Structure formats: C-alpha cells, structure tokens
C-alpha cells in the first residue's frame, strides 16, 4: 500500500489564488489575493505537501508568477510541488534551487521526452510528470490543445526514467466537483510502476473514503482544490480519515 497524500491546490493567476472550471482561464474564480497566506493556512491545517500551479506560466511556456511562488516558499516549511511553464532545464534548476521540492513537467513531457529523462537523471526524486487528459488524450499548453497521445502511452514512456510521480488530471472533471475519475486513474496506475496521484473532480469526503478503498491501493494520493475552498471538505476530517485508514492497514499488516 502506498502512503496516501492529500495535496491542497494553489492555482496562481496574475498573482492571485484561483480555481478554474475545466481549465478555462475565462472562468477563474478568485479565492484569495494572498497565496502565501493561503499556503500557510494549509500548512497549519496539517497538510504535508502543497500542490502549486502557475496557470499563466502554463499558457506562456515560462514562469509568470515567480513572486507569488517565492512568497509561498517563504511562508511554509512543508514541501511544495510546482507545475506550469516548466519547459527548460534552467527553469527546473531555478525552482529547485529556490526550495521547490518537486517540479511537474507537463507539455514538455509530450513534446520533449528527452528533457524529462535528463531532468530526472540530474535531479533524482525531484521530477514529476503531469498528464492532463481530455477523453483519454493528453492535453498540452495549459490544456488549450489536445495531442494524439493517450495517458497510458505517455506514462509508459517514462517507466524507466526515474520520474518520482505522475499527476493525472481528468480535465472534464476539474473544478466541477463531479468526483475523481477512479477507473481512468487506476488504469494508468496499473500500466506503470510510477506512483500516480489523482486530480480533477474531488468533491467530498466520500471521494477521500473511495481513495482509501483496497482497490485504490496503487494510488499515491489526490489533489483537492475547489472542494477545499468551498468548504465541501473539512481538512481535519479528511486528514483524520487518511490517518485512520493507514493505522488500520498497519495493524493488519
């Protein structure tokens, strides 16, 4: 059984903390003008990791919210994984040098697999691949375009690359609170040996309990965004459920 991690999401647009609906920048809902304060709140609530995305960077292909990310890194001691606009080695080096614990490579994983392999070789345990899918096909450039590559195909390309994790997002469910796409996420987790983190659609504590069912043992965790901001998920309740499940498994081992 993989240790399950629940990642609170901070999506950055123009320096603010927002949530999108199915990746549509025109449907950005602002939840906080102070991402660093939001990060500190998540850390105080007991979360062990943060998931941060530079949305403007994902569209631009280069970091666009550096000041906000810097402020988040200064505000918390827990590890931060960061994605959005990471398409060059100097960007990887820059963020890791500033204290980001893990960088997520998305578009470049489709366009330039050798870049991912080289980054994983140079920075073991620090590189994740973001696989964002629409109808099973991988989307790129801030989800603005869809490739011909399937999620399973892309995951298998990095099977022996030393990638630390895959973050799998079902775009159709992202920000609409329809529940995680467990079947598709599990299919990917079964196709690769890389730890897979589920994203997109997590809506309630029921989704957390579903994640903790025995058939989801391959999954390494999930990312929660809108449900957390909307108050649909109580952080203490969610984290306590994960602790109880892991204690029960430990007792039964």
Swiss-Prot record:
Disulfide topology: none
Known pathway:
Amino-acid biosynthesis; L-histidine biosynthesis; L-histidine from 5-phospho-alpha-D-ribose 1-diphosphate: step 4/9
Q: Which reaction does it catalyse?
A: 1-(5-phospho-beta-D-ribosyl)-5-[(5-phospho-beta-D-ribosylamino)methylideneamino]imidazole-4-carboxamide = 5-[(5-phospho-1-deoxy-D-ribulos-1-ylimino)methylamino]-1-(5-phospho-beta-D-ribosyl)imidazole-4-carboxamide
Give this protein's Gene Ontology molecular function annotations.
1-(5-phosphoribosyl)-5-[(5-phosphoribosylamino)methylideneamino]imidazole-4-carboxamide isomerase activity
Q: Which GO terms describe its biological process?
A: L-histidine biosynthetic process; L-tryptophan biosynthetic process
- The active site consists of 11, 132
In terms of Pfam families, this protein maps to: His_biosynth (PF00977)
Q: Which SUPFAM superfamilies match?
A: Ribulose-phoshate binding barrel
At the top level, the lineage of the source is: Bacteria
**Enzyme Commission code:** 5.3.1.16
CDD domains in the cross-refs: HisA (cd04732)
Annotated family = Belongs to the HisA/HisF family.
Query: Which protein, by its recorded name, is this?
Result: 1-(5-phosphoribosyl)-5-[(5-phosphoribosylamino)methylideneamino] imidazole-4-carboxamide isomerase
- What species is this protein from? Methylobacterium sp. (strain 4-46)
């Amino acid at each position: 059984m993989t240790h399950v991690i629940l990642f609170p999401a901070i999506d950055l647009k123009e320096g603010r903390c927002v949530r999108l609906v199915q990746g549509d920048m025109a449907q950005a809902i602002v939840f906080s003008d102070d991402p660093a304060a939001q990060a500190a709140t998540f850390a105080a609530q007991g979360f062990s990791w943060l998931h941060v995305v530079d949305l403007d960077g994902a569209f631009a292909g280069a970091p666009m919210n550096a000041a906000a990310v810097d402020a988040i890194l200064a505000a918390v001691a827990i590890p931060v994984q960061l994605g959005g606009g990471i398409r060059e080695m100097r960007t990887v080096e820059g963020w890791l040098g500033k204290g980001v614990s893990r960088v997520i490579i998305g578009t470049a994983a489709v366009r330039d697999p050798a870049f991912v392999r080289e980054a994983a070789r140079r920075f073991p345990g620090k590189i994740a691949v973001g696989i964002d899918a629409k109808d099973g096909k991988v989307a790129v450039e801030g989800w603005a375009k869809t490739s011909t590559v399937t999620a399973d195909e892309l995951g298998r390309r990095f099977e022996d690359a030393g990638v630390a994790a895959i973050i799998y997002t079902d775009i159709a469910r992202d920000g609409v609170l329809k529940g995680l796409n467990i079947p598709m996420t599990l299919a990917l987790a079964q196709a690769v040996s890389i730890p897979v983190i589920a994203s997109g659609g997590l809506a309630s504590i029921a989704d957390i309990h579903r994640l903790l069912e025995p058939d989801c043992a391959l999954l390494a965790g999930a990312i929660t965004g809108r449900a957390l901001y909307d108050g649909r998920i109580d952080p203490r309740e969610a984290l306590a459920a994960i602790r109880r499940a892991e204690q029960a498994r430990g007792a039964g081992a």
